[in-house]
Amino acid sequence: MAKKESYEEMLTKLQDILSNLETDDLNLEESMKSYEEGVKLVNKIYKILDSYEAKISIIKDDKELEFSEDYGDK
């Protein structure tokens, strides 16, 4: 089973792809493959960030509820 790439690994890979695309050393076919791989990585990265954003929102809402129960109007 393949190891799941971390956010940091994907971000580094995306930065490498962007650097390669900016050098103009790739032919058209290589550029398209790199571009497609980059788009896939961006989508994976956004999914990870969306997941963490949802978790933060839940934690924040729980803490606000806890705070209002502890210190709210009685």
From Swiss-Prot:
Primary localisation category: cytoplasm
Recorded family membership: Belongs to the XseB family.
Keyword Cytoplasm (UniProt): yes
EC number of this enzyme: 3.1.11.6
UniProt-recorded Gene Ontology molecular function terms: exodeoxyribonuclease VII activity
Disulfide bonds: none
Cleaved signal peptide residues: none
Nuclease found in the keyword field: yes
Domain of life: Bacteria
Reactions accelerated catalytically: Exonucleolytic cleavage in either 5'- to 3'- or 3'- to 5'-direction to yield nucleoside 5'-phosphates
PANTHER family to which the protein is assigned, alphabetical: EXODEOXYRIBONUCLEASE 7 SMALL SUBUNIT (PTHR34137:SF1)
Cellular component annotations (GO), alphabetically ordered: cytosol; exodeoxyribonuclease VII complex
InterPro entries in alphabetical order: Exonuc_VII_S (IPR003761), Exonuc_VII_ssu_sf (IPR037004)
Descriptive protein name: Exodeoxyribonuclease 7 small subunit
Keywords: Cytoplasm, Exonuclease, Hydrolase, Nuclease
Enzyme class: hydrolase
Chain's gene name: xseB
UniProt record, GO biological process: DNA catabolic process
Annotated function: Bidirectionally degrades single-stranded DNA into large acid-insoluble oligonucleotides, which are then degraded further into small acid-soluble oligonucleotides.
